[in-house]
């Protein structure tokens, strides 16, 4: 792949500010020592190497990320962001770097429901979500009744807070992409599991301010990585 890499744009050591949330393992999160790690960090480091750019990381909340990138406060945003047409009105997306499907993450001893239909049928069951996210919309329209104000959806500022509420019994379901869901299950020592069929598929992309001249180089690097 050396020949391909030589054909990539050379950004001549340009500093790029990338904003992340550090709250969506295994894509990006803080390890036990407080270091930011994850698949997206590894991918961005490789993209930076191939494009000869220097990455500086900043941190913000999910609800602030798209507006902040849209306004030009940051050059790139990454936190497992689903490529959606409504978001394209505010930001530009890279090509997809990962495809995932929603899974139902529940406590390891859960027996009251086994799939989306049985969860939806039991009015006592609650799900966690972050507002405006793909899991929120999948929960509303594929699991529940299409009412975005359904009181069975409990809102949390971060994905991790929703998972913690699941662990403690404050909610009964978290929807997440399969990559993150499997990561949580593997680390849970049997306290979490995945049930039911996979739900709507989603493609993840990096986000940029509208008209950014970084989209084409990053897309070229993503294609180069995929060819490896």
Annotate the PLM regions.
Residues 5-80, 89:
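Extracytoplasmic small-molecule ligand-binding "clamshell" domains
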Residues 22, 99-106, 178, 186-223:
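Periplasmic-binding protein-like
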Residues 63-67, 79-90, 138-141, 167-200:
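A ligand-binding cleft/hinge motif common to bilobed small-molecule-binding domains
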Residues 108-126:
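Flexible hinge/capping segments at coil-to-helix
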């Amino acid at each position: 792949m050396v020949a391909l890499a030589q054909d990539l744009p050379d950004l001549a050591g340009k500093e790029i500010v990338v904003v992340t949330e550090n709250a969506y393992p295994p894509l990006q999160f803080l390890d036990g020592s407080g270091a930011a790690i994850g698949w997206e960090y590894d991918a961005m480091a490789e993209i930076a190497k191939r494009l000869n750019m220097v990455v500086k990381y900043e941190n913000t909340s999910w609800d602030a990320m798209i507006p902040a990138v849209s306004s030009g406060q940051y050059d790139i945003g990454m936190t497992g962001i689903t490529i959606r047409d409504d978001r394209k009105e505010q930001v530009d997306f890279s090509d997809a770097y990962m495809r995932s499907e929603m899974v139902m993450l529940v406590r390891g001893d859960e027996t009251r429901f086994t799939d989306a239909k049985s969860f939806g049928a039991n009015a006592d069951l609650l799900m966690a979500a972050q507002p405006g996210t793909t899991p929120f919309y999948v929960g509303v329209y594929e699991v529940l009744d299409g009412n975005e104000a359904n009181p069975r959806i409990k809102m949390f500022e971060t994905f991790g807070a929703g998972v913690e509420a699941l662990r403690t019994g404050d909610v009964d379901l978290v929807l997440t992409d399969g990559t993150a869901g499997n990561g949580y299950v593997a680390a849970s020592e049997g306290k979490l599991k995945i049930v039911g069929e996979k739900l709507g598929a989603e493609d993840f992309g990096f986000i940029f301010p509208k008209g950014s001249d970084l989209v084409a180089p990053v897309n070229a690097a993503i294609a180069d990585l995929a060819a490896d």
